[in-house]
Structures are given as C-alpha cells and as structure tokens.
Amino acid sequence: MNHGGNTQAVAPMDPNSIENRYGVDGSQTQKYSYQYSTGSESAPWTGHSVENQAVENGNYSNSNYYHPQPTGPATGNVQEIPNTVSFTISSTSGTANVAQDYSGYTPYQTSSDPHNYSNTGYSNYYSGYQQQPSQSYPQPVGAYQNTGAPQPLSSFQNPGSYAGTPSYSGTYYNPADYQTAGGYQSTNYNNQTAGSYPSTNYSNQTPASNQGNYTDYTSNPYQNYTPDAANTHSSTIATTPPVHYQQNYQQWTEYYSQTEVPCAPGTEKLSTPTTSAYSQSFPVPGVTSEMPASNSQPAPSYVQPWRPETDSSHPPSQQPGAAVSTSNDTYWMHQAPSLQAHHPVPPQNNYQSPLETKPLYETPFQGHQRATYPQEMNSQSSFHQAPLGYRQPTQTAPLVDSQRVSKVQIPTNPRIASNLPSGFTKMDKDSTAASAAQAPAYVSVSMPKPKDHTTAMSDPGTFPKSLRGFVERAFARCKDDKEKESCEVALRKIVKKAKEDNTLYTRDWDTEPLSTVTTTNVTNSESSSAQLSSLQNKSPTRRPKSRWEPLVEGKPFVKPASTFSSAVKFGVWNHQNENNKKSSESFQKVDAATGFKPTYSGQNSAKKSFQRPVKRQRFSGGAATAIDDEASSDSDKDLTPYYSSAMALAGSAEEKKRRDSRSKRFEKIQGHSRGNDLTKPKNANVGNLHSRRATALRLSKVFDESGSRAVEDIDWDALTVKGTCQEIEKRYLRLTSAPDPATVRPEDVLEKALIMVQDSQKNYLFKCDQLKSIRQDLTVQRIHNHLTAKVYETHARLALEAGDLPEYNQCLSQLKTLYAEGVEGCSLEFAAYSLLYITLHSNNNRELLSSMSRLSEEDKKDEAVRHALSVRAAVTSGNYVMFFRLYKTAPNMNSCLMDLYVEKMRYKAVNFMSRSCRPTIPVSYIVQVLGFTGAASEGTDEKETDGMEDCLEWLKTHGANIITDSNGDMLLDTKATSTSLFMPEPEDAVAHGDRNLDVNDFFTRT
C-alpha cells in the first residue's frame, strides 16, 4: 500500500478463507492503541485489519488511491490535473493498479505519466490555480444511475478509461446525487479486460474465458515487496496510458445547489477524512514491511473555503471511493468480514457532510485538523494517518454509536433520520456482536412501549369497559327483581374470584358467556322482602274500590318498607337502548367487599324505568292486596309520608262521612233507584269493581307481554264488555278505567233510551248528554249495527238543528265509517249534509271534489243530493237569488246548514246591489230577494209585513241608509249605503266561542 510516498507490503492471505474474500463489517469490537513517532520506528497495533482488495483471477490486488479535492473557483472553468496516477504492482499472476499520492515521491517520467508532476508544481497548482493542458472530456452526469441493486459488469459500456461518478452496489442511493458543492470526487481507471468486458470499479485484468465473472477465483497470495530506501517503487507501468479529464466543479455546484438535500443520508455527523502534511510510518498488522514517512511535501498555502468538520465521537466508516473492491460486493451481500479498518483519523464517507453540520463536541485535535489537513481523501483499502505529535488515547471498546453505524453501513435519507447515530434502541446495544447479515438494512426506529395494565389496576375505582358491558348484559336478561337479586350475587362472586385470580383486567369479558351468571332465586333475609313476597303471591285480580266509595272498616294500612333493596341500591334496570347509554357512564362506584357496585345511573333512572314500583296499597274488604308486581317509582317515594298520614285519616269517622257524601253523587235521586240500592247485596259494587279491574289487568298484560304488538293481534273479543245495567237514563261520564259491566246498558235498553231522547221535550244539552252516554255504551260493547247508525244520525240532526258543528263533525265521521262497513242508514241524506258543510263552511275544494266523485248517477238523482249540488253552484257563482230560492225549498235538514250561511250571503247581496244600482232600491224588493218572507206566507199581508220589518231591522243593523219617498215607500239609498255597510258582531256571541253553553244551562247541569 502506497501513501504519501510510503511503500507498504501486503501479507499473504489464505485464498480459501471466505473472510479474506469478503468485505468489511464494522460491527466487530476493536481494541487498539497507537504509538506514533516521527521516524521509521514501528508502533504496536493490536486489533483487526481489513484488506479491501479487488480480485483478479484469484489474485488479490491492493488497489488504493488518494486524491485531495480542491474547491472549484467561481468561474467554474478550472481544469483539474489528474488526481491519481495509475500504476501497477508486479505479482506472479497478474498486475494491479495502485493509486499513489503526489506528495511522497520525486518527479519522474513514465509512458503513462509524461507530465512529471512534482511536489512543487502540485503545491503551486493549489496556490495559484494553474491549469495544466490536458485532453478535456465532458463529465458524464449521472451516466450510471444506481437503482439500489448491484449492477453487472457487462451493463456498463466502457471502451477504456473514463472518469465518472462511481456506481457500486450495496447502497440505496446514487452517490452522484448527494455530492456537495464543496468538491467533487473523480478517479482515473485503468481497466484492462481481455474479453472486452468493462469493469466499473476495478483495475484488473480478466481473461476472455472468465467472461467478466469474478466469482471463480484461484488462490494466489500477494508477493512481498521490499521497501526502497530512496522512496522509489519497484513497479511496472501499466500498458494503458492514463487519460486525464477536465473537471468542471462549478457545474456540480450549480447542479447540486438546486437540490434540497443538504447531504447524503446517514452522513450528517460522521467524521471527515483528513490527511496530514507530515505523515508518519507505523506498522499495521498483516503487513510485512514498513514505509518511512515522507515529510518533504509542504503544506498548502491557500486557505480552504470549505472544510468538513469532524466529530471524534463518530466511528470510522469504510469508504467505497471511486472503485469498488470485493469488500464492497460482500458488503452488499452481507457476508462475514475478514479484516477491519482502523483509522486514528477517521476517513470521510463517500457521502460528504454538509456545511452546516456541527460536531457534538470539539477537541484540539479537531481544530488542528481544520487548520492543517487537506480537504478529504478517498481510500479503497484501510490506511492509517495521524498528525505529528498527536497521541491517540487507548480505546478499549468502541462507542455504541460506532458499533451501530458500522453495523448498518447504509446511507439514509436525512429527511427520515436526520440524526442516525443517536436514534438507536436497546436492541442495537444487545446485538453488537451480531453480523451484518443478521441485522436488517433499515433505520432503527424506537417502538412505543405497550401500555401496561398497572395504570388501570392501580385505580381501584375503575373497571374495564368490557366488564361493564358484561354486567349490563347480565342485568338486561333479568325479568323481575328476584332475578336481579340473584344476578347481583352471582356477579359479585365472579368479580371477587377474578380479583383473586388476577384475571379481572386480562379476561375477555366481551366473549364471556352469560351462562356463568346464575339466576337462581336468592332468599332475602330482610323482613320487608318476605312481606313483599307474601303480598305478591296473592291474586292480582282483586281490585280495590274507587277512592270516592265508602271505606270498609279494617285495620289501617301500613306501607311496607322498601322491599327492592337491590333496585334502590343498584338502580332499576332499564333495558331500553337510550337508557343503556346513560347507565354505563356511572359504573365507577366500588363496593367495600368486592370493589364492585354496578350503579347504572347517577340520576333517577327509576323515573323512566320499564317496570314501575309497587304503588300504594288500597283497602278492599279489610285486606290489603297488591295491585301489581312492579317496582316503586320516585314519585311514590316522595309522597310516602303523605300516604301514611292519609291512610291514618282514612279510618276516621269524619273521612267516612265525606266519602259517603261523595258516593251519593253517583246514586240516583229517584226513589226507585234508591230502593234498588237497598236490594243490592253488600259487596255488589265491590264485585263489579273487581271485574272492571280484572279486565284492565288482562288488557295491560297483553301490552306488557309484547308492547309492540299490532292492534290486530290483540284479542278484543276477550276484552268485550256485556252490559247488565237496566237503567234507561244515564248521564255521560268520561271513562278513566276499564268499564264496569254493571254500569253498561245492553242493546235493548239502549233502544229504549234512544226513543226517550227523541220524544223528550228538554233542551239540546240534555239530549246531547244522553246521546253521548248511549254512544259510549255502544262503543265499549262493540255494537256496530243499524242501532249504532240510528243513534249517530239522531245526534247529528240535533247538532245541526242547534248549530253545534263540532258535535256534528264527530257524528258524521262515525257515520262514514259505518256506511263503509255496510251498515244501513240514511247515507244519501248525510251525503247531502256533507256537501253543504264543505261548500258553506270548510271551503275545502279538494274534499268537495272527492265527495262529489264518490256519488253515482243514482245518488245524484236524490232530492237532498240534487239540492246540495244546486246550492254549491249558486254559492260558487255568487247567485244570491238562486241561493235564497233554494233556501226556501230545502229538504230535510239542509236549511239548517244553510241558516249558518244566510247572514253572510245577505251581506254580500246588499253590497252588490248598492254598488250596481242607482240611485235607490225599494225595500220590498230586497225582502223578496233575500228571503225574509216564507214561501207558505207569501199571500198573506201579515207575513209580508213581518218580513218588511225584519228586513228594515237587518238593514239598519248593518249600516244601510233607508229613505222614504213622497208616497211613503221605504227605499235603500245605494250611494250612501255602499260606503256605510258593515258586518256587526253577533248578539249571541260568548267569550268561549260556544253559544250553546249558556250560563243558565250550565247551572241546570249541576
């Protein structure tokens, strides 16, 4: 190995050793120490070394080169002299091109180097930027783009020696893409290939029979070289002369300054190679001879504008350089290393550091480097340099960062990992002895530590969400409070066992079967639960009497204590979906024994619970019976003190008298009804009440079993009431509970009651009350026949006669339903009423057209229907003359509906006449046109006079101007009336809007 004019002999190696054939692995631990001297005295060096060699038909050639790179000037036209001088070292089996520095030997001329560059000329070149004439070739920019995979030797078209960006395998990036503006690396290659196979990174000779395949090698060790005392070299000159290329560094400065990548990935804080002007010689293990140092080269006098800063804390790295040896191939193939390089002054990686890169800490040695050493060097094999007078401290073990970087040995993207050496993990520390083949070629990323369960387990008040869901599902299956109690006990056992086994936070509660929760009946030790169970076992069919009935003497009722302790303690479970969301929020309270208390809602969840609580008990026959088995509500809890005081007063004599007086309100005032009450058995009313409550219970049970059942699925026949009451006259009372058959009249009694209403001479309010009572009895008994239609028709006629349109609408809607079911009745009569009502009052054209479309041709021939259609035509066209003619000849109850519209039609008629006629209109004409006289009384003078008076009164009431002519006839002044006519307020109008509710009639009802 030649460096700075020093000659180094390489020791022979075992050709069969794989370790000697393959490249460097920087992950091995090194131990070394340095002793430097100014003379030729050797310094001991203990550790591994590397032979980074190219293989030439089984021979190992030590192809080393070194070239300093100056910074290109601003003009970008500086021509660079050859950086290297190619020469070969003689061996028994082949020749190898060995790079040699300019500063270590005297000038001489050879056939391959006629320029004879001396040390002085080379130094002056740097100081004065002198340009030597040479043949200029353009620099191929990125001619060989490396895609990350190893390129075969046959893929490069190399006719001879060329200077270009080195392309080598084993990296993910093209080295040419990451060169900084401070310098550019270029090398001269001397490839002699017998078979015309280009070798990109080797200076070798390959016979044609080898076909460029350098995998089959023969063992041929190097020959020992005798160092020359005069610093000359015993070497043969290569037959192919080197060709020097012109380098344009400014071109690369402009090109690479456009990129955003400041430096090659993974080389942000790596050390920078430096060479000393004062080189010294020291022995290297595996080398048979020593080379004396040459101190004849002067230091450059120029100031380097750019200089990569070194970092002593970073490890030495193997630099592929411009040529790639077997070490580079084996580095890509991740094979075992043979020797390892040691650099007292760490060499710069092939990818240069950016300008802004700063070391972690500086040493005087680094400052000395920045002041003295050249910019950089490229070394194919391992060599050692140290400044004069510097003593390297003994280092027993490399840093962890060094081990990691040497192990990975790949450039990384600075955007992904800007600080590669500092981002190692514990795995990298433990695997320092592992080979490069075992470590993946990726950047190590610190993985987040998995969350520990100790955080959740440290807080005794929290439980896993899956456990809460398991508890909710378990309680959702409970149908009554007994199952809830047993489920509670079972859940406590399960949670306690899980805590003892330390599986509370590790068990998968989402998949835990609910069969583990036993729902066996648990006997409650509290006396209140025993009392409740005895009450619940009683028959629920017996219902208490109404609170308005006289109270039967018996023991005062004492409300039992709260029996649903579990419901109160754990909250009443609501299996509805909207309540399940709220219930899971408050599952944080912990029981003292097991640390488990499923409180489902912080608010009063019982208010919306599906199961109601036990209502306050009532007495019937001196025994307290449970009304239902439902849980108690908050409203009853709040009213518990009031209930107790009320029950205490219920047994007093004063309360009995009050209830007796209230019950008399429902008794008949007539003597026969009083006598009937005396003949009734003592508990007759009680039995009727029980029957009514039983019906209500059956109905509620149907809805409880399936609240979403359709109406058609309910067995209404089982709930039909058959009346037994024989009273003809009965007042109407709104139903608040299931009907009592004893108070419902059968069908024959209802027919008698209808005849009684039709023949009665009482007012409309009495008849309406009786008819509504009849309708109620028909409804609860589900009677839909001709009697039902007759009752509704009678009530509708009375409502029309009284002008009670709301009641008429109710009757008419029921009649339409009955007629649609095929029940016989006066369908055409009420069809005419419907047409008149829609035309005169609702003014709903769509409904009017729908009603007219349902009429057949035969229906339209009916007198009432034909009259209704004529009235519609008169109202639509505004023909008031035709309207009042039809009003006089209206059949059935059509005139009653028209009476409600007569006032409005007369106002429109007078308004039309006053605007269209001038100057006056006789009042006698208005009387005839507006229908103030009846048709039967037209020939009598008395009726005509009455009509005249009524007409004059109406005109004056509406603001008409009446004058008298010379003959004494009454005339309407149309001009004055057109501006003074108005619609007055009705005289019988009341504040509540229903004129039928007269004050006198209201008092008669009480």
From Swiss-Prot:
It is found in: Nucleus. Residues 116-140, 516-539 have a biased composition (Low complexity). Its main location: nucleus. Residues 653-680 have a biased composition (Basic and acidic residues). Disruption phenotype: No visible phenotype. Sac3a, sac3b and sac3c triple mutants show no visible phenotype. Signal peptide: none annotated. Interacts with EER5, SAC3B and CML20. PANTHER family: 80 KDA MCM3-ASSOCIATED PROTEIN, LEUKOCYTE RECEPTOR CLUSTER MEMBER 8. This is SAC3 family protein A. The gene is SAC3A.
